[in-house]
Regions:
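Conserved inter-motif catalytic segment of the P-loop NTP-binding fold
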Residues: 2-94, 98
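Phosphate-binding/switch region of NTP-binding enzymes
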Residues: 85-123
Length: 123
C-alpha cells in the first residue's frame, strides 16, 4: 500500500533505506527504529501499537527477532558469566501475548525474521 507506514525494527543494520526503494517501497514511509535487545523491542512496539487506530495503514517489520539478546543475556556477558539464558523463551511467549491482541484488533500485519535452524551441520 503506497499510503502505509512501515515500522522497521532493526537489530542487524543490514538493510539501508535505499534497499526499500529498490523493491518499490518509498523510504520516506519507513520509520527506522534500531533496537539492541528484546526489551527495547517490546517497550517501543507496544507504545507504537497503542498509539495506532484501527484503519491506520501500518506494517511492522522486525529484522531480526532471532538475533536479539535479552537484557539478562547482555548483563551475563558484561559480568563475564558463561550461562544459558533460559528466560528468553518465556520472554518471547509474553511478548507475543502482549502484542498479538493489538495487531489483530487494529488489523496491523507484522513480519519477523527468526533465524531458527533445526540443525547446524551446514554452518
Amino acid at each position: 500500500n503506497p499510503e502505509a507506514v512501515m515500522l522497521f525494527y532493526d537489530s542487524e543494520f543490514g538493510s539501508p533505506l535505499q534497499y526499500f526503494a529498490s523493491v518499490g517501497i518509498d523510504p520516506t514511509r519507513v520509520l527506522h527504529i534500531p533496537v539492541q535487545n528484546l526489551e527495547e523491542l517490546k517497550f517501543d512496539l507496544l507504545k507504537q501499537l497503542q498509539a495506532c487506530e484501527r484503519g491506520d495503514k501500518v506494517f511492522v517489520y522486525v529484522d531480526s527477532i532471532g538475533n536479539l539478546a535479552s537484557l539478562k543475556e547482555v548483563q551475563d556477558a558484561t559480568d563475564e558469566k558463561s550461562v544459558s539464558d533460559l528466560s528468553r523463551a518465556k520472554f518471547l511467549k509474553g511478548f507475543y501475548r502482549i502484542i498479538t491482541p493489538y495487531l489483530r484488533i487494529k488489523d496491523i500485519p507484522m513480519v519477523q525474521i527468526g533465524h531458527i535452524y533445526m540443525t547446524m551441520e551446514t554452518y
